[in-house]
């Protein structure tokens, strides 16, 4: 209907992002189950390494560009930023709509790329010469590049929109130092997107012309260098991983302070500076993904040290969350369970990151399952746990309905066991030298791979249970009578769900 297709309402567009992200998440999860099924026993299941690599590549692209980013930035960002700023809507409401509607064509292009020719079996990094016209002939990689172009344009437009909204549309009284941490996290994320995505666009456009127009940016035969591609890609790719986690940081800050019954997060100004520091440092560490290409020892020393420095502002955030929790009598609501799970598991993932920051160690562990375990701890148990926490926490605000808390707690336990069983053994596999992006392995690696695959099945059950819980809530229609929160953030002063136009008169906020 016209309301959805041509919407200029931040709430409706946010809801579209949630639905799109959930759908893409199911596709991405299905691909991950295929990966674990293939690795669940020695020997072949799919029987074709190209198809296996296409599945791995698509799993990464879908989870990053079509699940985490649309839900965190598009879903939570659109819904909450205007409400938390006391703004009537986003600064550019029609551009907001366009940002969303660029995503379904982008996802379609990605899915089509896997259905024509041989698919793009390059890994999400799309390194040449494997992604060149010789090793990957046909249209698949080109379609994947176009998909990334559209998703990138969508994100850049969204970033401009969020930055403008935050600069221009804050209510009187919301000074920058008093702006909610989630809004801060989104605006920092938007800045990172704005600065990093054009570099990715440049890299993949150069790859496109290398493949189709006979240029040789990345071809040594014509004076090019494949390492240039790696530098360009990772100059985008490292900020990207912070883009995936920063909005999660913002949500976790809100959830922990509200569930602790505190007025604000401990050290909220320090939290802002920490996020700014993470955003800045994220741009000057990219070559730690390239320790194995052969860099000078002093270059490696720099990237090792700079990478470890990121642990400092991250540690400030972890300990501030713990300080916020300090002295509270917690009632273990589902949202706080996810938030506590986030703090613990994100810390574990961060520690393995510090291990990998050591360039000499990384040369051994690069492209092994240790790296896979590291980034799935921070993404599958960082970003995803933050999404789960945020969704459960703000669901009553978004819908005016309540979820079944007892079921949500069981679902948390199932999911917690599932993801840890899936990814913890991968540390052992990596230390034992099992390489990434292979569809088979020597028998010695069987045991932990079987454990990992069992874990992925448990996770799948947890996700299906979650969708059932949401369905049950929607059909039961248990209305929220009044929010039980201590209103530490102004979005809770809305009706549940908020009126279509939340702030007809601009609010005046005083201390």
From Swiss-Prot:
Fe(II)-heme a binds at residues 59, 376. GO terms for biological process: electron transport coupled proton transport; mitochondrial electron transport, cytochrome c to oxygen. GO terms for cellular component: mitochondrial inner membrane; respiratory chain complex IV. Keywords: Calcium, Copper, Electron transport, Heme, Iron, Magnesium, Membrane, Metal-binding, Mitochondrion, Mitochondrion inner membrane, Respiratory chain, Translocase, Transmembrane, Transmembrane helix, Transport. It is an enzyme of class 7 (translocase). Its cofactor is heme; Cu cation. Mg(2+) binds at residues 366-367. The chain crosses the membrane at residues 15-35, 54-74, 100-120, 143-163, 181-201, 232-252, 266-286, 303-323, 336-356, 378-398, 412-432, 450-470. There is a cross-link at residues 238-242 (1'-histidyl-3'-tyrosine (His-Tyr)). Binds 2 heme A groups non-covalently per subunit. Binds a copper B center. One of its GO terms (molecular function) is cytochrome-c oxidase activity. Ca(2+) binds at residues 38, 43. Heme a3 binds at residue 374. Cu cation binds at residues 238, 288-289. It is found in: Mitochondrion inner membrane. Pfam families: COX1. It catalyses: 4 Fe(II)-[cytochrome c] + O2 + 8 H(+)(in) = 4 Fe(III)-[cytochrome c] + 2 H2O + 4 H(+)(out). It is a multi-pass membrane protein. Its main location: mitochondrion. Component of the cytochrome c oxidase, the last enzyme in the mitochondrial electron transport chain which drives oxidative phosphorylation. The respiratory chain contains 3 multisubunit complexes succinate dehydrogenase (complex II, CII), ubiquinol-cytochrome c oxidoreductase (cytochrome b-c1 complex, complex III, CIII) and cytochrome c oxidase (complex IV, CIV), that cooperate to transfer electrons derived from NADH and succinate to molecular oxygen, creating an electrochemical gradient over the inner membrane that drives transmembrane transport and the ATP synthase. Component of the cytochrome c oxidase (complex IV, CIV), a multisubunit enzyme composed of a catalytic core of 3 subunits and several supernumerary subunits. The complex exists as a monomer or a dimer and forms supercomplexes (SCs) in the inner mitochondrial membrane with ubiquinol-cytochrome c oxidoreductase (cytochrome b-c1 complex, complex III, CIII). PANTHER family: CYTOCHROME C OXIDASE SUBUNIT 1. Belongs to the heme-copper respiratory oxidase family. This is Cytochrome c oxidase subunit 1.
